[in-house]
């Protein structure tokens, strides 16, 4: 972006200056609305989420057999919700900032099959596509026991079709593993940030991995191009997919059920704050949508991004969405948080969700490494760097009097609050890689 254009952008949006300087930045969204007001802009409804829920239930008998690690939950891919009181104390001590309320961790990092939040959306979209093909071919009815999809005739049927996706790692992992298990031919287009072990794991499942020297945007574009030339190839579009988004959104009612089981209350007097790491936006956007449907105006969602990849904060704050990239303002999009190394946000998610998100913030790679180490020490939970992005949220919210006043939170409401950090990945990181991460923390 030329200087004159840049100067006028900064004049209009002074916060951009902090982003360019790679400073850890927090922006509380002045444009949030009620769910009733913001919902029409999403273009999806509660019924769409119910349909996704029903589809995952139809596939549960299949998943329980195809992936024995899901058998205990009857083929439902869901993660644990745990309190992390020792980490809460550590954060308060390190940041000299009390965190009012209780701190919880949602362990999507340890979801079965692919060990990340992408086991929600990625697997769901592959299953939805497989179901559509099988129904259209007359091989399946909605009333069937879907475990019949494991039979050789189905494998044979699906092998005529292929799936392609562009990814920095975790989405490719979930789509690759699931597609290969169903019988699809699958190609994952991996950006330069993708970890070697993720590529190796995909190849071990018979997935074709195409590697790029460039970033996520290029990998997605190339994947899209390659798929266009083959009518039997289905491209999973992380930047625009409503199906992926709905796969993530099912998490809302699942979490509501977990809260009920644990006797946790969410209402006006007991607000819920949720902190979601954000790459291109599909995962956190879908989860936030599901949370809003489940808890209404009593849940407050925040997106967390690396200082080197603040694409969603930049897009929503300036209103330019996918018309601007972090590279346009001189930021390099290079971060240890490989799952969040995205320079241009999803235009669909930004526009759909901008009224339903309370805020956005950035944090440095070093902050993620530090918190990664503290969590391992205090709670014995090991995550990959990007999964710690949400962990910086509670102190930002608790430190901001202006945010609390904007939403009219009393001291008592904050004392009764639940702060939920969404841990997005790390359950399958090889030990030597994890040791390298731990060594970087302070």
From Swiss-Prot:
UniProt keyword list: Lyase, Pyridoxal phosphate
Enzyme Commission number(s): 4.3.1.18
Keyword Methyltransferase: no
InterPro entries: D_Ser_am_lyase (IPR011780), Ser/Thr_Dehydratase (IPR050147), Ser/Thr_deHydtase_PyrdxlP-BS (IPR000634), TrpB-like_PALP (IPR001926), TrpB-like_PALP_sf (IPR036052)
Signal peptide from the UniProt entry: none
Modified residues (N6-(pyridoxal phosphate)lysine): 118
SUBUNIT field: Monomer.
NCBIfam families: D_Ser_am_lyase (TIGR02035), PRK02991.1 (NF002823)
Protein name: D-serine dehydratase 1
Chain's gene name: dsdA1
């Amino acid at each position: 972006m030329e200087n004159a254009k840049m100067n006028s952008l900064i004049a209009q949006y002074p916060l951009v200056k902090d982003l360019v300087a790679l400073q850890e930045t927090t922006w509380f969204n002045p444009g949030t609305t009620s769910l009733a007001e913001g919902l029409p802009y999403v273009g999806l409804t509660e019924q769409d989420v119910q349909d996704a829920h029903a589809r995952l239930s139809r596939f549960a008998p299949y998943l329980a057999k195809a992936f024995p690690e899901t058998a205990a939950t009857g083929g439902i891919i869901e993660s644990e919700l745990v309190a992390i009181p020792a980490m809460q104390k550590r954060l308060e001590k390190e940041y000299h900032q009390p965190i009012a309320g209780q701190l919880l961790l949602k362990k999507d990092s340890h979801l079965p099959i692919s060990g990340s939040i992408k086991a929600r959306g990625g697997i769901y979209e592959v299953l939805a596509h497989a179901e559509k093909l099988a129904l259209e071919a007359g091989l399946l009815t909605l009333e069937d026991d879907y475990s019949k999809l494991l039979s050789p005739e189905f494998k044979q049927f699906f092998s005529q079709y292929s799936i392609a996706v562009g990814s920095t790692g975790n989405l490719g992992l979930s789509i690759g593993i699931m597609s290969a298990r169903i019988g699809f031919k699958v190609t994952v287009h991996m950006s330069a940030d993708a970890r070697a072990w993720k590529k190796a794991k995909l190849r071990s499942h018979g997935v074709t991995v195409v590697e790029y020297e460039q970033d996520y945007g290029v990998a997605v574009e190339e994947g899209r191009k390659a798929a266009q030339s083959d009518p039997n190839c289905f491209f999973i579009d992380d930047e625009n997919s409503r199906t992926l988004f709905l796969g993530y959104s099912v998490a809302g009612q699942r979490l509501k059920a977990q809260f009920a089981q644990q006797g946790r209350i969410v209402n006006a007097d007991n607000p819920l704050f949720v902190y979601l790491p954000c790459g291109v936006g599909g995962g956190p956007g879908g989860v936030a949508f599901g949370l809003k449907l489940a808890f209404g105006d009593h849940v407050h969602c925040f997106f967390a991004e690396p200082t080197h990849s603040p694409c969603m904060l930049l897009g929503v704050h300036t209103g330019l969405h996918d018309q601007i990239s972090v590279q346009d303002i001189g930021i390099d999009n290079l971060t240890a948080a490989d799952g969040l190394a995205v320079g241009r946000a999803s235009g669909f998610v930004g526009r759909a969700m901008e009224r339903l998100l309370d805020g956005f913030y950035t944090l440095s790679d070093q902050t993620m490494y530090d918190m990664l180490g503290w969590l391992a020490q205090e709670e014995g939970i090991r995550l990959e760097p990007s999964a710690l992005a949400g962990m910086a949220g509670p102190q930002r919210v608790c430190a901001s009097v202006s945010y609390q006043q904007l939403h009219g939170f009393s001291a008592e409401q904050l004392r009764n609050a639940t702060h939920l950090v969404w841990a997005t990945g790390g359950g399958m990181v090889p030990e030597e890689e994890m040791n390298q991460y731990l060594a970087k923390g302070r």
